[in-house]
Design a protein with these regions (language model features):
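Generic beta-strand/beta-sheet core signal
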Residues: 21, 28-30, 56-57, 82-83, ...
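Conserved P-loop NTPase "ATPase switch" module shared by AAA+ and STAND
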Residues: 60, 72-95, 111
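Walker A/P-loop NTP-binding active-site region of P-loop NTPases
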Residues: 30-69, 116, 125-126
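Generic, well-ordered alpha-helical scaffold segments in large soluble proteins
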Residues: 33, 41-49, 84, 88-91, ...
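Conserved P-loop NTPase motor module
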Residues: 1-29, 33-48, 129-131, 156-184
Length: 184
């Protein structure tokens, strides 16, 4: 279990945890919403723990770069962080990284934590756990899986706060404020 945010269930404020040992995780939101911050925060905590093999993929300039930050031979699980994965998840993507990502999403020994701007069926059908950063456009927010009742609790100012999102795990959803990445 990986702490990543403060959660508000309407009664208590508590720490929210991502279960990186059971299934893929989608992080969905607009540019500047806090997706990369969340990936970096989680990657640094897992890296420091030494509990698993860490991979981090991102686009730099016009090419995809993957850093294998730490391999852990005693642990079978790989956690693969993919930032700005929209292009790789496109059904028309013809690059090797796209094929590797699609294979990893189906591999039970790999947890993919992928950040995208728009909800995509390729990712959503493989991710029962999501952190969605609402944009204020109700139809788009509901497509991300955010229940209307949770959206009703968001004020106008909430949409402008980086890291303010909704943690969705199977049939449960609650507002969260993600931790801020402080650097390695």
């Amino acid at each position: 279990m990986l702490p990543f945010a403060l959660s508000d269930d309407g009664v208590l404020i508590s720490t929210a945890f991502l279960d990186v040992g059971h299934g893929n995780i989608a992080v969905i939101g607009a540019c500047g919403s806090g997706k990369t911050n969340l990936l970096l925060c989680c990657a640094s905590r897992l890296y420091e723990s030494g509990r698993c093999t860490i991979r981090f993929t991102r686009k730099t300039n016009s090419e995809w770069t993957t850093d294998d930050g730490r391999t852990s031979p005693q642990h079978e699980r790989t956690i693969w962080f993919v930032d700005d994965a929209d292009e790789l998840l496109s059904p028309f993507a013809a690059m090797p990284e796209a094929d590797k990502l699609k294979t990893a999403l189906a591999d039970p020994s790999v947890t993919v934590i992928a950040a995208v701007e728009k909800p995509q069926s390729t990712l959503l059908e493989r991710c029962l756990t999501r952190v969605a950063f609402p944009c204020g456009e109700r139809a788009t927010d509901v497509m991300m899986g955010i229940p209307s009742a949770v959206l009703d609790g968001f004020g106008v100012d909430d949409y402008a706060i980086a890291g303010r999102g909704v943690f969705i795990q199977q049939a449960r959803a609650c507002p969260v404020q993600c931790a801020e990445f402080q650097g390695f």
